[in-house]
Amino acid sequence: MSINEETSRLYQREPSVALPQPFAGLLNLALILVISEGVWYGLFSPAGPVTLYTPNVGLSLVITILMVIHWGVDVFDFWPFSRDFIMKTNRFLKGFILLSLSIGIAVLVMFGFYYNVIGRFGPIFFSGPQLIVSGGLGQYSQTAIENGCYAQIMMNTCVIFFTIMWVRSFGFSPWQLSNRLTKSLSVWLLGIFLGIIAFSVLFYPHIAYQFYPPQIFMAVPPWWSEWAMTQSGLFHFGWIVSALVLLYWTKMLWEGKPFSLIKTEWLSGTVMMVSVIVAGVIIMLIGNRIMDWYFGSEAFIGGNTTEQPAWRWNHVAEMALFMQAAAVVLYYYFDNWPVKGSLPVRALVRTVIAMAGGLLIAKLYYLLGPVFLGTVKGIGQENDTSNCWTVMFLILVTAHAVFFDGFPFKKKNVL
């Protein structure tokens, strides 16, 4: 995750710890891996004390935290904190305050807003506890909570995608001349509005039809089921996450190119929006073909786990997030290497590193996950997804780099 150039210039810090690369990057990566292991065991691991990885409860929580961090950094530009606070406050204290605030707001959104406002007085499917209270057929504790968190995951993913897509494509237009809070609130509300529309079309039909009996007067049958070979909204999750990763990469790895070559802002933004959506769908379809080759069979209705269409679409998202994990490590911890040479060459090398690094992270996750994370052995298991760990890792890296300024090994703030 990165932020707009204005914020980057505003909050750049002077060098503080002069460790040369790649030592600073390797030390920070080692530090964050140790922290991620501790956080995972303490909050998510089936062998730990809290066991949030059900998996949807844990995944819903980390996606909500990621959404709030995006709001605070990309949309609100650290409001209500001042420039002096960001620049002059002790790095550890500043990071603790910003991360704690982000987590606190996320918990309020998930357990306060979704569980006890929306789920209690509106669409009940956002709240597992309210589904249990309803006494509906099949809504026992585990199923109800997983269903409620699934709805939150998909809604929050839509909000993240359309918020970042607008910021990357159009900045704060058409409110760029307004004051800081006005333009931030406008983009924030627009991202939520577009996310609700997308959720209603792409995910709500699946949610309405996952209950028994199907809620035929509340939603149309999943309109994508014939050619997606599944009623699951994971079909859309696959291409949205892939497109979201491309949005990240346009800023992080490609430095705004090629879309910034179009000088007319509205045209550049429109081309970017259309391009990443189309590319996301193409990546998902290509990823499915690669899995046909890797697993030795095509997906089909009624297949085993790795042959289920819904699992395949979700696995595309999982692989995209593994590659995003490699990209943020390169961007934040290794100064977005390489930084010399022509931009096309730099962008190509960074992209190859992110893709290869993502494949390596995926291999290590499935190989070492059962030992260090308590996950189930094998690449395809029911009720298991790597997305929870990957999003948690993205949060930790981003918070460490942006909130804590890479403390203690990074030599400068990398906002």
Describe the residue ranges of each PLM region:
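Membrane-proximal helix-loop-helix units in multi-pass membrane proteins
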Residues: 111-155, 283-332, 339
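Long, acidic/polar, low-complexity amphipathic helices and coiled-coil-like
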Residues: 101, 108-125, 131-237
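C-terminal transmembrane-bundle signature of multipass membrane proteins
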Residues: 30, 34-41, 235-253, 276-291, ...
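Transmembrane alpha-helical segments of multi-pass membrane proteins
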Residues: 17-30, 88-108, 180-197, 264-282, ...
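N-terminal signal-anchor module of multipass membrane proteins
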Residues: 1-72, 156, 391-397
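Membrane-helix interface motif
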Residues: 34-49, 108-132, 197-220, 282-300, ...
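Cytoplasmic membrane-interface regions of multi-pass membrane proteins
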Residues: 2-17, 69-95, 159-186, 208-214, ...
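Alpha-helical transmembrane segments of polytopic membrane proteins
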Residues: 25, 52-69, 96-97, 138-159, ...
